Amino acid sequence: MKFLDQEKRRQLLNERHSCKMFDSHYEFSSTELEEIAEIARLSPSSYNTQPWHFVMVTDKDLKKQIAAHSYFNEEMIKSASALMVVCSLRPSELLPHGHYMQNLYPESYKVRVIPSFAQMLGVRFNHSMQRLESYILEQCYIAVGQICMGVSLMGLDSCIIGGFDPLKVGEVLEERINKPKIACLIALGKRVAEASQKSRKSKVDAITWL
C-alpha cells in the first residue's frame, strides 16, 4: 500500500475548501460517481450503526427543485455536478430489537454488539429518543467529513450545506424516496476559481498538548 508523503498530505489539506461555485459544464463520469458513493458507504460510525442513507442527485431538474429551497445556496447547487442528500435514520430504527439493528450485523458480531449498544442507550442516553436522534446526526456528520475529504483526494470539490428547508426538500424527494429525514446536503463538482487563502486558528489557540 502506498501512502502520500507529508508534503502532499499537507497540500491536499490546505487545498480542500468549501467550494461556493462549481463548473456547471463539468459532468461526473460513472466511475467518479461510483467512487464517491463508495467513500460514503465506507464511512465509520459508532457501533458500526451506519444510521444513514445517501441519495446522489445528478438530474438537473431535480437539483433545481431542491436548490429552490436552499435559501442563499441556490445558484451554487445548480452549478454543482451532483448533489448528495445525506438522510438520517429515525431513532426508532436504531432500537436494539428492531428490524434494522437485527439485520445489520453478521450473527457473530450481533451477539456482541447489540447487548453493548442496548446498555449504552440506557447508561448514556437514559433511553431518550431525543438524545438518540442527536447521536444519529453525529454519525451522519462523521460520514460527511469523510466524503468531503475523499472527494478532495479525487481532485474534486465539495461544499457542505446546512442552509435549506428540510421539509420542502423532503417533499421534492418523497415521490422517489419514502419520507426522507434529511441531515444535510453536499454539493459536488469541480471548482471554477482557485480557493481563497485558508483561514484557521493558530496551533496555539487550536491545540493543547498534555
Swiss-Prot record:
It is an enzyme of class 1 (oxidoreductase). One of its GO terms (biological process) is response to antibiotic. GO terms for molecular function: oxidoreductase activity. Its EC number is 1.-.-.-. InterPro entries: NfsB-like, Nitroreductase, Nitroreductase-like. Changing residue 97 to T: In strain: 69A. Changing residue 183 to V: In strain: ATCC 49503 / 60190. NADP(+) binds at residues 150-155. Changing residue 49 to K: Loss of function and acquisition of resistance to metronidazole. Changing residue 56 to I: In strain: ATCC 43504 / NCTC 11637 / JCM 7653 / RPH 13487; resistant to metronidazole. The keyword Ribosomal protein does not apply. Keywords: Antibiotic resistance, NADP, Oxidoreductase. Reduction of a variety of nitroaromatic compounds using NADPH as source of reducing equivalents; two electrons are transferred. Capable of reducing metronidazole; inactive RdxA renders the bacterium resistant to this compound. The reduction of metronidazole generates hydroxylamine, a potent mutagen and bactericide. Belongs to the nitroreductase family. PANTHER family: NAD(P)H NITROREDUCTASE YDGI-RELATED, NADH DEHYDROGENASE_NAD(P)H NITROREDUCTASE XCC3605-RELATED. This is Oxygen-insensitive NADPH nitroreductase. It comes from Helicobacter pylori (strain ATCC 700392 / 26695). The gene is rdxA.
